[in-house]
Design a protein with these regions (language model features):
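Short conserved segment of the HATPase_c
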Residues: 74-88
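Short helix-loop "hinge" at the ATP-lid/N-box region of the Bergerat-fold HATPase_c
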Residues: 42-43
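A residue-level detector for a conserved hydrophobic packing site
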Residues: 31-32
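Acidic ATP/Mg2+-coordinating residue in the GHKL
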Residues: 69
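Short beta-strand/loop element within the Bergerat-fold HATPase_c
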Residues: 50-61
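Conserved glycine-rich
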Residues: 49, 115-116
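Conserved catalytic submotifs in the C-terminal HATPase_c
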Residues: 8, 13-23, 60
Length: 137
């Protein structure tokens, strides 16, 4: 239940590609917050219609997951600041959409808590891409 996300209610489609089972010994609430906050961010700011979540790597020690949307992306110079607390790319649009500016910071700290790392980049064909890893044990 914690991981159930409904972007369809906001007019977006969720596409997943997990070709094998992933088991992580971690805090379910924090792992849920990673997916929830990334999804809420995509719904609020991407202006796209699709969210893609895929398993990139799954081995004995870690799994790597890619979370993407097909929106407009952000300027390259802002990518490094996306995980800062209270940072907003477009301050005017953020006020209209609500939120605290903490979502992506929460994502980063939840990933770090699980011994992983996270990066943000623009997709070549538009939108944002988040690649993150989670240690299994």
């Amino acid at each position: 239940d914690e991981l159930e996300i409904m972007p369809e209610d906001e007019g977006m489609s969720l596409h997943t590609d997990f070709n094998e089972e992933v088991v992580i010994d971690g805090n379910l609430s924090l792992i849920g917050s990673i997916f929830r906050n990334l999804t809420e961010n995509a719904i609020a700011y991407s202006e796209g219609k699709n969210i893609f979540i895929s398993l990139v790597k799954n081995n004995e020690t870690e799994c790597c997951i890619r979370f993407e949307d097909d929106g407009v992306g952000v300027e390259e110079k802002q990518l490094s600041r996306l995980f800062e607390r209270f940072y907003r790319v477009d301050k005017g649009r953020s006020r209209q959409k609500g939120g605290t500016g903490l979502g992506l910071s929460i994502v980063k700290h939840a990933v770090l808590f699980h011994g992983g790392s996270i990066t943000a980049s623009n997709r070549p064909d538009g939108g944002l891409r988040f690649d993150f890893s989670l240690r299994k044990h």
